[in-house]
Amino acid sequence: PPPPPGPPPNP
């Protein structure tokens, strides 16, 4: 399976 998504970008 594909890797999990990374963390959200900083604002």
Curated annotation (Swiss-Prot):
Function: Toxin. Induces vasodilation in mice and rabbits.
GO molecular-function terms, A-Z: toxin activity
Tissue specificity remark: Expressed by the venom gland.
Compartments (UniProt record): Secreted
This protein's name: 1095.6 Da venom vasodilator peptide
GO cellular component terms given for this protein: extracellular region
Keyword annotations from UniProtKB, A to Z: Hydroxylation, Secreted, Toxin
Tagged with keyword Secreted: yes
Domain of life the protein comes from: Eukaryota
Organism name: Bothrops jararacussu (Jararacussu)
Chief location: secreted
Hydroxyproline found at: 3, 9
